[in-house]
Amino acid sequence: MYELILALGWDLLLGEPPAVVHPVVWFGKLIAFIDSHYSRRSPAIDFLAGLFATLVVLSFAFLLSILPLYAPYPLNYLLSVYLLKSSFAIRSLYEHVRRTMKDDVEEMRKEVSMIVSRDTSKLGREHLISASIESLAENTNDSVVAPLFYYLLFGLPGALVYRAVNTLDAMVGYRTSRYEYFGKFSARLDDILNFLPARITVLLFLPLNPRRVIRYYKMARFKVNSDKPIAAMSAVLGIWLEKPNIYRFPGRDPRMEDIERALKVYVIVVSEWILLLLLGVIL
């Protein structure tokens, strides 16, 4: 339990460790190295190469997670807390989303582009606000609920391996000519691992507007985990959230102050999750 409490305290008080010593950054560099050194071939070979890349990255994550077992006291305790903290990002997510609140549209586009994969160069203010809030909702699962869910189930290996899978999906899990087959295995694995956490995230939104959250949840695409927390956030805020030509949850037009409202919802949801985690560890 000390490990979880200290890791949460580190995150809330200090935020992220420097990139040069951040395990998730290491995962990203390893993925980028493998990706850049593999020349695409046939679909079958690309799929096998992607499978191999996934196994390499997950093996690295697992080896990192067991380092504390072989470290001397008290380094083992410090390593455990440090590695667990690196698997989730409560404060960092809050700060990144808050920085998108810019009066100047061009500045806002730049900030939003840092937290979403879509092209923001031609998005209007309402769609920029929507994209910012969508990212907050989706990453409430990916960066907070899911890694700590797998920590609760499998300890430090669960948290770091999940984070490695999520990083793989974020980097190569796209349906493009380059990644369609190379990223398929890691994308499907990410879908499987996020199935339960995404729905747990929705349950955390439920007390804020039960009837509407349930109604919006039913609108979300069944097979797409990321839709679920976005639908829940849209329901609670009462605004439309939209990725053009992909999905749209109904409501009034989003306004700048809705980002602030979304951040308050995020604080409530994360607080609920932390409380449940601590109760789970105690019991």
Swiss-Prot record:
Give Gene Ontology CC terms. plasma membrane
Q: What does this protein do?
A: Converts cobyric acid to cobinamide by the addition of aminopropanol on the F carboxylic group.
The transmembrane segments are: 5-25, 47-67, 142-162, 263-283
Locations listed in the record? Cell membrane
Pfam short name (any one): CobD_Cbib
HAMAP family in the record: CobD_CbiB
User: Which Gene Ontology molecular-function terms are recorded?
Assistant: ABC-type vitamin B12 transporter activity; threonine-phosphate decarboxylase activity
Gene Ontology biological-process annotations: cobalamin biosynthetic process
Q: What S-S linkages are listed for this chain? A: none
Q: Which family does it belong to?
A: Belongs to the CobD/CbiB family.
Gene coding for it: cobD
Which keywords does this chain's UniProt record carry?
Cell membrane, Cobalamin biosynthesis, Membrane, Transmembrane, Transmembrane helix
The answer to whether UniProt assigns keyword Transmembrane helix to this entry is yes
Q: What is this protein called?
A: Probable cobalamin biosynthesis protein CobD
The organism named in the record is Pyrococcus horikoshii (strain ATCC 700860 / DSM 12428 / JCM 9974 / NBRC 100139 / OT-3)
Query: How would you describe this protein's topology in the membrane?
Result: Multi-pass membrane protein
The pathway that the record names for this protein is: Cofactor biosynthesis; adenosylcobalamin biosynthesis
The organism's taxonomic lineage, starting at the top: Archaea, Methanobacteriati, Methanobacteriota, Thermococci, Thermococcales
